[in-house]
């Protein structure tokens, strides 16, 4: 007999049913994203020869992939995602595990991501979902919007001489002999000053299509690489319309010539100078362009507020490229859901 305040089996069933009625984002991701179509790529990246059939059975790579997606949804470390899958029913159900299953530990998650990175599979996962979007009638249309956001990483505690060597692409004295220390040093992250504030880390430059708002192309670079240098790599020739929107960092005759050569029509913000201020007509054109260009700011806003922020704790350009490929892919998952409703509740 249940005492006052105790919950019975039917109470628990009713609780689960009420939670499912809310259709939280993890439930909708489970139902809407073609997870099984990723399996061949995941198997290719995670395949490894077994010397015998003894030992622990290999974990389903789809479970591990969903844990990587959870990391990006909430900006979790490997240790945090292990804990949260253990702690939260919704996380456990999303990855496809039950209370009687063992949860993959942080080391397994990190090892899986590294195997995918080294096999070049993470980029293929992004491209595969891009193909799925096209098959669903969500081709890139309406022109493209290009922008970049700074990606902060933990600051390195180096001496002035060590930083000088790193900036000159030289390995500081003594680091090569100390492999443990070298593994903890980021030789690729760089400082950059923006609006009078110093930032340390990387940069995620993206191209979204103006009609649907999906990330179609992206490039991850050290923070000191100027936004405009990535323009040739970001332009999407598959967009069905030829307009290109970007802020004034991408302005200049050389970029105008590049767009013209590629058959694109520039909608890049015009930039004035000390002796040649913008005319009223140019200011009006910029105002109209800003209304459209704001769509790309919504992408970065989602990553900052809804996806746990942009701080990344990976070391080196290659690992940050892998991390942000997964981040951009996960954003596209959310954007795919958002097309059916504006209500996304991550909890």
Question: What are the language-model segments listed below?
Answer:
Residues 1-44, 339-347:
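Charged, often Cys/His-bearing segments associated with DNA-binding zinc-finger transcription factors
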Residues 26-69, 73:
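Basic, short loop/linker segments at the boundary and entry of helix-turn-helix/winged-helix-like folds
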Residues 34, 55-63, 101-105, 288, ...:
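Secondary-structure capping and boundary motifs in well-ordered enzyme cores
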Residues 55-59, 245-254, 272-274:
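Acidic, metal-coordinating catalytic cores used for nucleic-acid/nucleotide bond scission
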Residues 79, 83-86, 96-97, 104-261:
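Polybasic low-complexity intrinsically disordered regions
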Residues 229, 254, 275-282:
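Short, charged, surface-exposed secondary-structure boundary motifs
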Residues 258, 262, 282-347:
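Basic, amphipathic alpha-helical segments enriched in Lys/Arg and hydrophobic/aromatic residues
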Residues 262-270:
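Short hydrophobic/aromatic-enriched beta-strand-loop microsegments
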């Amino acid at each position: 007999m249940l005492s006052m305040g105790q919950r019975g089996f039917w109470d628990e069933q009713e609780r689960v049913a009420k939670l499912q009625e809310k259709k939280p984002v993890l439930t909708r991701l489970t139902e809407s994203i073609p997870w099984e179509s990723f399996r061949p790529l995941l198997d290719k990246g995670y395949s490894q020869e077994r010397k015998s059939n003894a030992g622990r059975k290999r974990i389903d790579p789809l479970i591990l992939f969903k844990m990587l997606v959870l990391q990006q949804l909430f900006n979790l470390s490997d240790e945090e995602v292990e804990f949260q899958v253990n702690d939260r029913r919704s996380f456990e159900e999303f990855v496809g595990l039950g209370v009687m299953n063992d949860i993959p530990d942080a080391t397994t998650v990190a090892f899986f991501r590294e195997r995918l990175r080294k096999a070049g599979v993470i980029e293929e996962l992004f491209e595969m979902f891009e193909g799925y979007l096209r098959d669903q009638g969500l081709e890139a249309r309406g022109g493209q919007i290009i922008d970049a956001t700074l990606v902060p990483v933990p600051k390195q505690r180096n001496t002035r001489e060590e930083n000088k060597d790193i900036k000159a692409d030289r390995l500081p004295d003594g680091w090569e002999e100390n492999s443990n220390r070298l593994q903890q040093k980021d030789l690729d992250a760089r400082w950059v000053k923006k609006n009078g504030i110093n930032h340390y880390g990387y940069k995620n430059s993206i191209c979204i299509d103006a009609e649907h708002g999906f990330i179609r192309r992206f490039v991850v670079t050290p923070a000191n690489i100027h936004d405009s240098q990535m323009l040739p790599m970001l332009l999407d020739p598959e967009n069905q319309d030829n307009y290109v929107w970007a802020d004034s960092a991408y302005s200049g005759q050389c970029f105008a010539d590049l767009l013209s050569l590629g058959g694109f029509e520039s909608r890049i913000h015009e930039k004035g100078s000390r002796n040649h201020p913008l005319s009223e007509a140019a200011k009006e054109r910029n105002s109209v362009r800003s209304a459209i260009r704001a769509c790309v700011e919504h992408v970065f806003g989602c990553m900052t507020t809804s996806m746990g922020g942009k701080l990344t704790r990976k070391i080196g350009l290659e690992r940050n490229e892998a991390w942000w490929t997964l981040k951009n892919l996960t954003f596209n998952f959310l954007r795919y859901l958002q097309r059916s409703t504006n209500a996304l509740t991550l909890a």
